[in-house]
Amino acid sequence: EPLAGEKANLQGDNQFVFDNNLPSIVIDELAWGSEAILTSTAAAAILIHNDGINILKRGITSKNNFKPGETCLRSIKDMKLISLANTKFYPGRDEFLYFCPNVPSILIVPINTKSFILIGGWSAKCFTKSDEKWINNWSKKINNMFLINNI
C-alpha cells in the first residue's frame, strides 16, 4: 500500500455537473459510481470524458472546460490505466490545470478508445492497487452501458 502524503488544499469548486443528454440509466450509474469513488477512496475529483465532451465533473474541480492532452490520449490509445502518483514530479502536469489545478495525484482510466475517467487524489501516492482495480472494473461496466445506449 502506498503511503499517502499530506492532504492538499485543492483549488476549485465542489461540483456535480453532468450531461443532461445522457439516458437516465447512464446518469444514475455515473452518479452512483462517482459517489462511491469519492467516499471510499482518497479521490477528491472525478471527470468522465467521452468523445470530446466532459459528461461528468464531480468533486473539487475547475470551472474551466478540461481538454485532454497527451497523457489522457495515450491512456485511451493504449487502453491502459495511467497512475501519476505525484504530479509535482510530472513534467506534463499542466495538462490537468483545467481539471483541478494543484491536484497532487491522478489516475487516468480508459473506458474505450474515445472515453476515460480522470480521478484526482487529495494527496500524493494516495491510490491503492485495490482502488485502481475497482475503478478499472467500473470502467468496463461504463463501457457496456455506453455500448447498450449507443453513446
Where are these regions (language model features)?
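Cytosolic beta-strand hydrophobic patch enriched in CBS
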Residues: 47, 107-110
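Signal-transducing coiled-coil linker helices
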Residues: 20-33
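Short hydrophobic/glycine-rich mini-motifs in sensory/regulatory modules
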Residues: 109-119
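Regulatory sensory and allosteric helical modules in signal-transduction proteins
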Residues: 53-107
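Short, hydrophobic-rich beta-strand element in sensory/regulatory alpha-beta domains
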Residues: 34-38, 42-58
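Signal-transmission linkers at sensory-effector interfaces
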Residues: 1-21
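Juxtadomain coupling helices with adjacent low-complexity linkers
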Residues: 117-151
